């Protein structure tokens, strides 16, 4: 069977290796490579062409055969590829439907499948191919040589035979009237016939078997089948027929039918033999698949009968032999009462059976009295088997007869000595040395062969590899007759390791000249063997391959060093691994660790020695990746080698390749020499070195990291929750994904958003809260967005720009408004945790992210707070008109942006709710708290608006305002940016508890009147009646006075604090407690000498006031403002205290002094006004007194009195300081 297929390499690379290393080497590789499930494994079997043709005949049809014969080589190759897969995988193929078919469950597929759902597997394997070949040999009854001889002519004949199928004649028969009786089974199994019913029945058309002899079809016997009768229910009364007789007749008919079929096939075979043996008759032999199958089955039955007869004869023969032996040994009687027993060791042997105790039944009887006990102590005679003596089976004693030895005389003595000496040498493996007058030759024994010690085995290259002389050759030839003899050896099998081998060459061997009858192997050149005793030219022995066993020397040194230097073991070592595989793995490890072409080459070793550590790691990684697949092919037995090499690779290649990070860190640290920068530099340098760093450098890096951890821990402990210094709120680098703007159903062909029905309902926004821009007024008319607290300039004027580049750049210049650093006002807290979406955006270093110039657009709404802005067309019915939010309604842009995410069927309800619920409640200039609350209410009705994207919201901390940016942009820049980007995030302003000052900012306008509380207090501080009314309405304005020590002391000295205490002592105890603390603080501030000391007293006592006020919640506006002021003072005190401990100073004292000086100038202005008004009032009073005096007194005294009044007036107005009535004089 091996001649029907061969194993060949499918890859061209393996085929080239086959030409170099031989077919045996490739077969060994393919055996290791051929695993189950390898889909390319089938192409590695070169199957005989005849076998593939027979497989095609078996599974194909006439159309496939005709296509194969008439097709080109590509068609034949495709069909042969299918045939090969069916033979190697045993998966069926249907050529009509061109589908692969499972043999078990009829599953079909267009592609070859290796595993079916029913559990059958169709992997490519040599076992499947051998089974297919066996089936072909059995079905076609051919030998492997006959299958190899099958060619295309056989296929062509098979196709012709199939096309000329047996003609079958059909014999029609008319419709007959059959007697149909209903049949029922009686209880006794007898068929009874009742009244018959006549029904028409059509008999089946029978086919006649024919034999085609030449062109004459010969009909055979027509086989009639029993017609199928469908009966009707009824009873059978006839007793004329029995069931057994009918069944017997049916069986006989079936047997007769089988015999007729067999006779037909035999007749066909006879006809074919006649057509083959009588060519003169010109008869065409008959061929069909059924005939071939019947022929194979018939031969199989004959072979099976013959084999069964032979097996039966052998059984009878063996039975007779064992029966005779048993009878002769009398085993039946000897094994009586014995059985085969298996002992503990598993040995089967005969043993006597043990008697079983028989149970006895107690007879039940009535109770009676025992009067006598009788015992018979006699013993019965025990039965013993007679001893049958066995047959003597001992062997006879061997008697050695003395042998006579013939006397050795003459040369036979030397031969006798040599023979015995050689036998001893071969038996014990003893080396022997032949010595003549001027020559020596050493012969060694190895693996049952004799070898001569040659010079090249010791590394010496010479013309003659061993010394020679005539006497030595005579002795050598005579000695080799007994030492070597005539052991067969093929010279072509000699290779490396055969140096010095002694053998007797044959006549046809390709060998060089040699002396005597024996040849001493030295090497080979050009396929020719050379003797070690021959003198060769330098050109010959320099090029020849000397068959020295280098591996033996290598393993000799390896074994000697390994045994000498290995450590003692704690267990008993066993040989579990293949030595050959150990050598292969050792070679791979050598190549990976020391990449070279030859391990004995000094140049290769010099290159390996001259490598630096980086080159060693790179070479190791490269070689390991190249040979990893080969190393993994040896399985888990050598997993320790792969693990060690991988660990070594990780250690040597643990280098830091991130040069960019190293340079950036070094650049940012620059030349800073103070801690912790020096520690960071040490760690950065050590990390960059990677595995090249020494142990000392790693120790230094660990110490530096410990110092950094200490520094950071100390810094972290100094930062508490809610502090400004630790706040970071970076803006997201990715733009928000708004699904409403990316839905294809809501975009036009240009990708713009389609409002649909929302556009019609959006008119409620534009009619109530937007105004149309009048172009006749010019864009500059709308460029100033004025609010009650300030002005913001928008960039609507930049819609008209100059084509001059210089002027256009001037138009793009922004107006920067400094908002200061991040303060407590920028941060929102909830349970002492940051609420980032309700806070201002910061950069990486904690500085605020400020707005830039916003360029204008026409008829758009601008969305997005992170990434690039998104421009959506306004839902206006007039495309040429431009709309801008009315004064105080900039926040309507938020609800207009929410309309984008509202479904069209809800747009009407949404716009109505905005108009009736939001617009009516918020009005102009609402706070962010109210806007967020209304947005939360709308989300309850319209959940789709929760993810709506907001326009950018800018925060103006100076004006306590939030600006909602529309499409007209902003020229003013420098505003802080609110991080909230969606409606869900904006709603966080309306959820308590939230500690945020920005929630009270107005959206697009003026802040609460409390923003000017201090200035309002300064305006009425010299107006007793107005100050009395203000402190009764807003008692916590006294706490606001802590912003300026001058204002605080003025209130205290004027008696306003005492008056407020007397007023509120009967009305609110919480307010009284706060006023009492403020009065005590005023006494402490009075003792302070400088402004800095006064501020320190206020800030040190701010926390106590804050804790006292934080216990309650008061309805006054000044309460929230004073609470926030105290919180700022308390936090700034903690921050400055930490900085002062670290040795840093702040600019806050200088700032406070400057502000206080400014407030004192305001006080001076107020005081000047009061003095001026007092002077005028005094002069008017004096004039009135003079007039009255002139009327009452005499005229002569009027002049004198007038001078006295003028002098008194001058004294009071210019010098008298107590002439002006103070505020304290007005409280009564």
From Swiss-Prot:
User: The motif Involved in interaction with stylet and aphid transmission: which residues?
Assistant: 598-601
Posttranslational modification: Potyviral RNA is expressed as two polyproteins which undergo post-translational proteolytic processing. Genome polyprotein is processed by NIa-pro, P1 and HC-pro proteinases resulting in the production of at least ten individual proteins. P3N-PIPO is cleaved by P1 and HC-pro proteinases resulting in the production of three individual proteins. The P1 proteinase and the HC-pro cleave only their respective C-termini autocatalytically.
Reported EC number(s) for this entry are: 3.4.21.-, 3.4.22.45
Q: Which GO terms describe its cellular component?
A: host cell plasmodesma
Q: What residues does the record give for site: Cleavage?
A: 547-548, 1004-1005
Q: Which residues form the Peptidase S30 domain?
A: 408-547
Q: Which Gene3D superfamilies match?
A: Helper component proteinase (3.90.70.150)
Query: Which keywords appear in this protein's UniProt record, sorted alphabetically?
Result: Host cell junction, Host-virus interaction, Hydrolase, Inhibition of host innate immune response by virus, Protease, Serine protease, Suppressor of RNA silencing, Transport, Viral immunoevasion, Viral movement protein
Query: What top-tier enzyme class does this entry carry?
Result: hydrolase
**Segments forming a coiled coil:** none
Annotated InterPro entries: DUF3725 (IPR022199), HC-pro (IPR001456), HC_PRO_CPD_dom (IPR031159), HC_PRO_CPD_sf (IPR042308), Pept_S30_P1_potyvir (IPR002540), Potyvirid-P3 (IPR039560)
Q: Which domain of life is it from?
A: Viruses
Motif mapping: Involved in virions binding and aphid transmission: 856-858
MF GO annotations: cysteine-type endopeptidase activity; serine-type peptidase activity
Where is the signal peptide, in residue numbers?
none
User: What the record says about its domains?
Assistant: The N-terminus of helper component proteinase is involved in interaction with stylets. The central part is involved in interaction with virions and the C-terminus is involved in cell-to cell movement of the virus.
Descriptive protein name: P3N-PIPO polyprotein
Source lineage: Viruses, Riboviria, Orthornavirae, Pisuviricota, Stelpaviricetes
């Amino acid at each position: 069977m091996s001649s029907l297929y061969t194993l060949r390499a499918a890859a061209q690379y393996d085929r080239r290796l086959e030409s170099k290393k031989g077919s045996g080497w490739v077969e060994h590789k393919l055996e290791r490579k051929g695993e189950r499930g390898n889909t390319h494994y089938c192409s590695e079997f070169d199957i005989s062409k005849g076998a593939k043709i027979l497989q095609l005949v078996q599974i194909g049809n006439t159309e496939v055969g005709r296509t194969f014969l008439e097709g080109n080589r590509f068609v034949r190759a495709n069909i042969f590829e299918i045939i090969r897969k069916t033979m190697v995988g045993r998966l069926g193929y249907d050529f009509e439907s061109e589908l692969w078919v499972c043999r078990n469950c009829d599953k079909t597929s267009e592609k070859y499948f290796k595993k079916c759902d029913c559990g059958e597997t169709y992997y490519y394997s040599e076992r499947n191919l051998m089974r297919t070949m066996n089936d072909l040999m059995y079905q076609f009854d051919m030998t492997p040589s006959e299958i190899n001889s099958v060619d295309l002519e056989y296929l062509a004949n098979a196709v012709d035979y199939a096309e000329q199928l047996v003609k079958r004649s059909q014999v029609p028969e008319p419709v007959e009237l059959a007697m149909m009786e209903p049949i029922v089974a009686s209880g006794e199994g007898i068929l009874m016939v009742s009244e018959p019913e006549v029904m028409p029945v059509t008999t089946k058309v029978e086919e006649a078997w024919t034999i085609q002899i030449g062109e004459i079809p010969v009909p055979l016997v027509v086989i009639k089948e029993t017609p199928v009768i469908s009966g009707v229910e009824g009873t059978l009364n006839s007793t004329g027929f029995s069931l057994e007789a009918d069944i017997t007749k049916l069986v006989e008919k079936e047997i007769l039918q089988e015999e007729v079929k067999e006779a037909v096939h035999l007749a066909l075979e006879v006809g074919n033999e006649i057509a083959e043996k009588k060519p003169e008759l010109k008869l065409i032999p008959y061929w069909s698949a059924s005939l071939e199958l019947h022929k194979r089955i018939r031969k199989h039955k004959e072979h099976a009968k013959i084999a069964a007869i032979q097996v039966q004869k052998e059984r009878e023969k063996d039975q007779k032999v064992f029966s005779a032996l048993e009878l002769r040994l009398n085993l039946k009687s000897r094994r009586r009462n014995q059985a085969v027993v298996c002992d503990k060791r598993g040995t089967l042997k005969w043993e006597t059976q043990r008697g079983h105790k028989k149970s006895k039944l107690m007879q039940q009887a009535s109770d009676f009295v025992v009067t006598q006990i009788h015992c018979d102590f006699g013993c019965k005679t025990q039965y013993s088997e007679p001893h049958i003596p066995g047959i003597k089976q001992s062997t006879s004693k061997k008697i050695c007869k003395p042998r006579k030895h013939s006397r050795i005389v003459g040369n036979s003595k030397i031969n006798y000595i040599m023979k015995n000496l050689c036998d001893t040498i071969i038996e014990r493996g003893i080396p022997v040395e032949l010595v003549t007058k001027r020559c020596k030759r050493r012969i060694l024994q190895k693996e049952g062969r004799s070898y001569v010690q040659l010079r090249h085995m010791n590394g010496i290259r010479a013309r003659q590899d061993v010394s020679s002389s005539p006497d030595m050759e005579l002795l050598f030839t005579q000695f080799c007759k007994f030492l070597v003899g005539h052991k067969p050896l093929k010279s072509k099998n000699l290779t490396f390791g055969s140096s010095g081998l002694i053998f007797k060459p044959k006549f046809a061997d390709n060998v060089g000249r040699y002396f005597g009858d024996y040849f001493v192997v030295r090497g080979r050149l050009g396929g020719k063997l050379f003797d070690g005793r021959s003198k060769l030219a330098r050109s010959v022995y320099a090029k020849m391959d000397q068959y020295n066993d280098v591996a033996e020397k290598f393993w000799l040194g390896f074994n000697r060093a390994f045994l000498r230097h290995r450590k003692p073991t704690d267990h008993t070592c066993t040989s579990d691994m293949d030595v050959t595989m150990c050598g292969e793995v050792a070679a791979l490890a050598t190549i990976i660790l020391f990449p070279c072409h030859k391990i004995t080459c000094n140049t290769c070793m010099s290159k390996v020695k001259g490598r630096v550590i980086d080159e060693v790691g790179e070479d190791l990684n490269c070689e390991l990746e190249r040979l990893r697949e080969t190393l993994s092919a040896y399985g888990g037995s050598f997993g320790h080698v792969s693990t060690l090499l991988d660990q070594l690779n990780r250690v040597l290649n643990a280098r830091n390749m991130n040069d960019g990070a190293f340079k950036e860190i070094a650049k940012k640290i620059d030349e800073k020499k103070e801690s912790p920068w020096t520690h960071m530099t040490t760690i950065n340098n050590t990390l960059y070195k990677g595995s090249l760093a020494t142990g000392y450098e790693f120790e230094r890096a660990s110490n530096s990291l410990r110092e950094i951890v200490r520094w950071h821990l100390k810094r972290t402990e100094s930062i508490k929750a809610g502090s400004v210094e630790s706040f970071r709120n970076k803006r997201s680098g990715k733009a928000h994904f708004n699904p409403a703007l990316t839905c294809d159903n809501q975009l036009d062909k240009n990708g713009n958003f389609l409002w649909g029905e929302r556009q019609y309902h959006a008119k409620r926004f534009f009619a109530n809260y937007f105004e149309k821009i009048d172009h006749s007024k010019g864009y500059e008319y709308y460029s100033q967005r004025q609010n009650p607290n300030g002005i913001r300039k928008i960039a609507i004027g930049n819609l008209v720009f100059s084509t001059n580049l210089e002027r256009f750049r001037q138009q793009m210049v922004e107006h920067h408004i400094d908002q200061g650093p991040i303060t407590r006002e920028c941060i929102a807290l909830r349970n002492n945790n940051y609420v980032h979406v309700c806070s201002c955006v910061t950069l990486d270093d904690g500085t605020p992210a400020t707005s830039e110039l916003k360029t204008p657009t026409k008829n758009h709404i601008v969305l997005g707070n992170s990434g690039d802005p998104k421009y959506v067309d306004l839902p206006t019915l007039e495309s040429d008109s431009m709309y801008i939010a009315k004064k105080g309604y900039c926040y309507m842009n938020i609800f207009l942006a929410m309309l984008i995410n509202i479904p069209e069927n809800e747009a009407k309800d949404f716009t109505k709710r905005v108009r009736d619920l939001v617009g009516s409640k918020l009005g102009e200039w609402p706070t962010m708290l109210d806007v967020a609350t209304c947005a939360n209410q709308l989300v309850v009705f319209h959940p789709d608006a929760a993810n709506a994207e907001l326009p950018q919201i800018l925060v103006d901390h100076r004006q306590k305002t939030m600006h909602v940016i529309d499409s007209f942009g902003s020229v003013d820049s420098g505003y802080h940016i609110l991080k909230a980007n969606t409606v869900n995030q904006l709603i966080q302003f309306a959820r308590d508890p939230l500690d945020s000052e920005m929630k009270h900012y107005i959206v697009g306008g003026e802040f609460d009147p409390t923003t000017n509380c201090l200035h309002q207090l300064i305006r009425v501080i010299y107006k007793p009646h107005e100050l009395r009314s203000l402190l009764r309405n807003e008692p916590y304005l006294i706490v606001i006075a802590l912003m300026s020590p001058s204002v605080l002391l003025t209130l205290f000295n004027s008696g306003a604090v005492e008056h407020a205490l007397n007023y509120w002592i009967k009305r609110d105890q919480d307010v009284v407690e706060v006023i009492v603390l403020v009065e005590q603080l005023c006494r402490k501030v009075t003792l302070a000498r400088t402004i800095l000391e006064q501020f320190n007293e206020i800030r040190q006592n701010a926390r106590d006031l804050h804790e006292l006020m934080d216990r309650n919640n008061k309805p006054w506006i000044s309460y929230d403002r004073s609470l926030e002021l105290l919180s700022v003072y308390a936090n700034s005190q903690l921050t400055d205290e930490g900085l002062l401990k670290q040795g840093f100073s702040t600019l806050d004292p200088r700032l406070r002094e400057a502000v206080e000086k400014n407030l004192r100038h305001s006080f001076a202005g107020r005081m000047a006004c009061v003095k001026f008004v007092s002077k005028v009032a005094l002069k008017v009073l004096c004039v009135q007194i003079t007039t009255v005096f002139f009327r009452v007194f005499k005229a002569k005294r009027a002049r004198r009195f007038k001078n006295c009044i003028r002098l008194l007036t001058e004294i009071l107005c210019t010098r008298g300081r107590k002439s002006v009535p103070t505020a304290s004089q007005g409280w009564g």
